[in-house]
Structures are given as C-alpha cells and as structure tokens.
C-alpha cells in the first residue's frame, strides 16, 4: 500500500476561501510519485507504550535511520473475514486527502509478515499493518490529569483556537470526525495542536458550514454507534441518524469545559443517564422543537422536568465570555449550535488575555492518557499531605499534643476512630515551617498527669478528646510502669522490613515483675491447676493446704506476668479487653477459667490435675458429642438442623426443638409469612445505542459506500505500480485461494 503525496479531492473556489493555512506533508516520494517499500518493525526501536484504543495500540519508538521520535499504531483486525481493517483503510484514505498543520499526518506504513509453521496458518495468522505518525509529547487527558500543570486562560484560548481551526478544515473537506474527545487531541513540544484518530470519520453529503448559517450535512443517514458516550451530542442520544457537522462541535464544547474543570463534565453510565445529565445541564428538551419527533422516547421523557444549570455551574470558574461561548457550543438544537467559523469569530478570542501563539506555549512535561493512574496517585498523595499539614510548628515528639494539632491522637492517626496515614513523629513527617514563639505556648505535660482545671486546653477540647485522655491514663496505669507499646507506624515498618517473626522475638526475653529470683513463667501444667476455681478447691476435702498455697502463689505470678506480656496492640484495644472482678485483664486461659456468678462451668477433662485423695471417677466427665435435633417443618426453619451447642449424654432428652437464636428465627418466620413489599426499581431499557463506539456492524462487507471507498483507494493508475499495492493484492489472492481450498476440504 502506498500513499500518494499531495493528492487532494478537487474543490470549488468557494471552499478554498474557508481553508486555513496548511503545511507540506513530510513525505518524500520517488520520481514517479510513489513512496518506497514499506518499512519493517526492525527499522524502529520501540521505547514504551503510549495508549490503547478500540482500533489499535500506540507505542513510542525511535527511527534507526534518522533518530526521530515517532508513534507506531498497530491496526487491529476485529473481523476474521477482512484481510485489511476497513476502519484503517477509511482512516488512511481520509488522511491522504487532508493537509493541515492541526491534523495528524501519516509518515510511513509498516507491514510484518506472519510467522507460519504451515501454509494453512495464514487463515488465522495474517500479517500486521502499522501506521507511523510524528510523536506528540502530550495529549489533552494527560495534561489535565497532571497535577503539576495548571493551564492559564491565554493557553486555553490558544488550544481552543487551534482545535476549532483544525475541525473547520475537516468540515470544509466534507468529512465528519465523529470521535472528538480529549484523548484524541495531541499537543507537541512546539505548542502545535493536532487532531488524531480518524477511524470513525466519514464523508458527509450536503452543504459545508457557513458563517452564521448553522451546520453542514444532514442529507444521509449514518449509524448511531459513534462518539464516546461522555462526548455524545443529544441528537444522537435521542436517535437522530441524519446528523450534521454539529456532532463534532458538541464534543468540542465538552472539551472546552474540561479545560477549566480538569475532568469530564458529563459522565453518564448509560445512554438514558447520559441524556438525563445533559438535560440537567442545558435544559429541558421542550426547548428543542424537533426533539419530540426523534425515536428514543425514553431518553426524551427523562429530561422533561429538568432545568438549565449551565451558567450557575460554571460562573465561579469561567469568565463571562467563556460561558457565552460554551453555551453556544452546548446548544440542544443542532441547527442553532455554533459551527466552527462562528466559534472562531466569538468575542472570547478577542478579549484580554489574547490567545498565545503556539511558539509562546510552555514546554509541558510529557503527559499521556496512559499516565492517568500515576498522576492520580500523585494527586491523592499531595492532597493527603496538604489536608493533614498543621498550620503551626510541630513539636517533634510522638507523645506531644497541642490544641493546634488536636485532630491527631497521641498514638498517631485520627481521633475518634478516623484512620489517617499521618503521624507527627519525626520519622514520618518533617514540617518546614519556621518555629515561632506564642504567648499562650505551654509545656506539654506527661500522660500520667491528671487534668488541671487551669489548663487552657480545656476550652478547646471536645468531650471525645477528654474521654480519650482518661482512657490513655488508665491504660498507662494498667501497664504497671513498663511501656511496652510500639506505635502503629513503627510496627508497620518493622513488619515491612523484617516480618512479624523478628518483632515477636524481640520481646521473648522479657521477665515478669515482682517474681522471686530463679522463678520462671508458669508451665502449662501449673496453669491447669490455676484454672480451677476457688469453689472447686474448697469442695475437695482431701486436698492438702500446700497445694492451695502453691496455686495461690502461681496465680499471683501469673497475674503479675500478665501485666508484662508483650502486647503490641494499641491501648484502646487493651482497654476493651474483658477484666476479672479485680480489674485485671483476662488471658485466654483465665477467661476460660473465670466462673460466672449464677452459672457453674464444668472443667474440661484435659485441664484437670488429679490430686491426693481425689479418685479418678470423680475427675471423669461425660463424653460430649454433637447432637442432631429434629425440628418441625416450618416456613423459616429447615426440617433437620444441626445444633451448634454440645449436649451431655446425661442430659434429659427434650421433644421441644432447640433454637439457637430465637430472635433471628422469629424474624425469618415473620418475614416468610408476611413478606415486605419492596418498591420496584425503574428498569433502564438498554437500546442498541448503548454499545461502544463501533462502525463495524454496518460496514463488514465491501458493498455500498465501502466499495466506493475501496475503489477510490485503489483506482489510481500510479497507485497500481507501487510494490506495496502488489503486496496487498498478492496477500488477498493467497488468502482467498487458501480460504477457498480450506472450505472445500
């Protein structure tokens, strides 16, 4: 395939006067006017991936011949029937006829032969085609997502002026772009804007736009599966098929507002929802006379009660002239919508500040749509630091507090259960404010002190803060003088670098307090005797007194040891742990052994330790097993239910079904008898226009306009002399031959 340089469709004299200045195509044909043999991928060094769309994958590369940076786009073949993608053929055919500085041009074509193990693989493994275009350092999505870039009004005017000039040239050549969005608008380091991705572009029939005369076209029906939903105009949402050049101006209006907001303004989840938010912004469809005649009545009816909010929404971020231009671009009636010539003559471009020249534009950091996630993380990080940064200096002590940073608790993180990633410790945060003295500055007191009635902080603290301080003091007293708490942030860092095992080994050598020399932590066998309740020891007449003294001594050691147990959980969690009748926190063993006042708890067999005078029969305990209970059939309860409790063999059998949770079962039974009547949610009808942007269903064969495109693409006599043309014809013949032979088999 070859591209003939300088080939244009004949135009009338009245069309030339609306053309903007153009630049020559950067293609060097041979003496016969043909481009030489197509390049190979090995002629380029791929650097990185720039993005991926519906019709191809774009990569940044460097030419090995001259060292220039280029963008290589792989043409994806969606249909196995096509030897060459029809969308790529249409894009190349249209770009061959466009020659403007604000339109992206094709420099080269690449063809890669398929790697086949046998001759039949050509049916599934065809050669790959690539287009080579000049490398553009940024696209509009990347610039708007980059937190380091803030567009000024003069820069916005320069971008909009170039965009309108480019789309005006496209419309004067009688083409519809049909996919205007921020991702398809590219900006180079020289400040020149280029419109890209003509995969959905089509020729239109009718008059070209004139100044003050509305849009052009509207004489032929097209598919409605065009334009990305967030930039889709209301006429396509309502089912119009004979649309005009106004569909591109609606997308430009959305991009114009996005330059001020930094994000898309009309983000719909479906076509019905998209139509609703459009009507909420620009007003009810009742103001548009022909809207009621369009086929999509569901989208029409959802906006009847909507009121216009465009001016109120953008009044605080856009000047008056910009709002007036935006209102003209986002007009419901496409025949009243501004065309490109009308927009270029708007007073927005003639008021101060004037639009910058492309050479005056700054050299922005390289920003593409693929960098969107990276920019989002960077933006969230900066926002978190700015929100948590205190207004005055920070005392670099993990336990210092002040009324100016009272939103952060003593232990790091937010107060009242609010999780934050900020800690006022020196290792986590460095403040750059210069310290300055204040008259009301005070020395931070230690956490064991009681609240002083003369403390000025009491005037600025809430009840939640005071309650937190009392809880901290109580936790400090319960710790027995030894601070074994590790801040959460430090613990997290230790776990990241060395894991939880090294953290636990760090405290293995800690010894209990108030224990005689040579004594160690109680063994598991001694813990079993400690777990016996006081009532059980008294009930054994043959038990010697020495055993009771030993058990009381061991109980005392354990109670002292509990206070020095290495516990890295926050003091708030320790405060919520259950305690015994003496206020001591319970461990897993002590919790199991703690008797209740009104109910006796039987001792497990494996924890009992036989003593002198106590027989084996007395220590025996009935074997416990799970019991299946038969439950009467009910609407809410199954016939057979497995009991979750353990039932002794000596217990009495009961015919009454045991219900583990009567409240839940009662609710279930009540709900089964009288089910609540839930309001029905309105169903959103999904029409054919809900599909993604595609034009393949109606153009899957070479009939109708596609045949005209192909004939126009291949009919030139000079084109047939090209070796690229011969390569495509040969591959097509091989495919038809092998495909026909494969079917006959």
From Swiss-Prot:
Protein name, per record: Serine/threonine-protein kinase BUR1
Using the record, list the residue span of the signal peptide; answer none if the entry has no such feature.
Answer: none
The superkingdom of the source organism is: Eukaryota
Q: What are the protein's GO molecular function terms? A: ATP binding; cyclin-dependent protein serine/threonine kinase activity; protein kinase activity; protein serine kinase activity; RNA polymerase II CTD heptapeptide repeat kinase activity
**One of the protein's GO biological processes:** negative regulation of flocculation
Tell me which species this is from: Candida albicans (strain SC5314 / ATCC MYA-2876) (Yeast)
Positions with biased composition (Basic and acidic residues):
380-406, 428-475, 493-508, 547-557, 599-631
Comp. bias regions, Acidic residues = 692-701
Q: Which residues of the sequence carry a binding annotation for ATP?
A: 50-58, 73
Q: Where is the active site?
A: 179 (proton acceptor)
Reaction catalyzed: L-seryl-[protein] + ATP = O-phospho-L-seryl-[protein] + ADP + H(+); L-threonyl-[protein] + ATP = O-phospho-L-threonyl-[protein] + ADP + H(+); [DNA-directed RNA polymerase] + ATP = phospho-[DNA-directed RNA polymerase] + ADP + H(+)
Q: Highest lineage ranks of the organism?
A: Eukaryota, Fungi, Dikarya, Ascomycota, Saccharomycotina
Q: Which GO terms describe its cellular component?
A: nucleus
Q: Which residues cross the membrane?
A: none
| Enzyme class, spelled out | transferase
* Localization in the cell: Nucleus
List the Pfam families. Pkinase
Protein kinase domain span: 44-349
Q: What does this protein do?
A: Serine/threonine-protein kinase involved in transcription regulation. Phosphorylates the UBC2/RAD6 ubiquitin-conjugating enzyme (E2), leading to monoubiquitination of histone H2B and the silencing of telomeric-associated genes. Also required for histone H3 methylation. Necessary for the recovery from pheromone-induced growth arrest in the cell cycle G1 phase. Required for pseudohyphal growth and virulence in mice.
Q: Which family does it belong to?
A: Belongs to the protein kinase superfamily. CMGC Ser/Thr protein kinase family. CDC2/CDKX subfamily.
Documented EC number(s): 2.7.11.22, 2.7.11.23
